[in-house]
Amino acid sequence: RSEKYVANDDLIVHGGDVSIFSKKIHPINRLIKTAKLNPNASIILLCKKVKDTSRYGVPKISLISKELFEVDEVVEKPSKPKSSYAIMPIYFFKPEIFSYLNKIKRGKNNELQLTDAIQKTIEYGNKVLAIPMKSYDVDLDVGTPESYKHALDASYKWIH
């Protein structure tokens, strides 16, 4: 539904189940800067190194630098992850993401999965990059009741 409002503009998508705070440069600003420096990238992902990848989309990456990865493949909640990075729910997309969303089948709960559209973008030969979260970035997950309570407690500490 949002395609008609985006038209030919690039866009940032931020999932509603995680808030990210930063003591320095916010990841959204880093995504935008990375997009300006890499205008041929169709998608730029934000990734975080995690111990348990079972709740995340996971990228298979090639290191360009310690600040930038090329994404070779993405899989949602893989049984055998190809990296220890999780895709965080803040994305930079060129508007062609909509054509790839239109090429994929609906998944669980009849929803289109961004991970599937990102993989389709890669399969069609488009460049997908990722930047890592920094040590000064904090993500607060509100996807489960336990993580929601933790996020409330942590955000209260953050502002006081």
What kind of feature is each model-predicted range?
Residues 12, 32-36, 65-142, 146-160:
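Catalytic-core segments of class I nucleotidyltransferases/pyrophosphorylases
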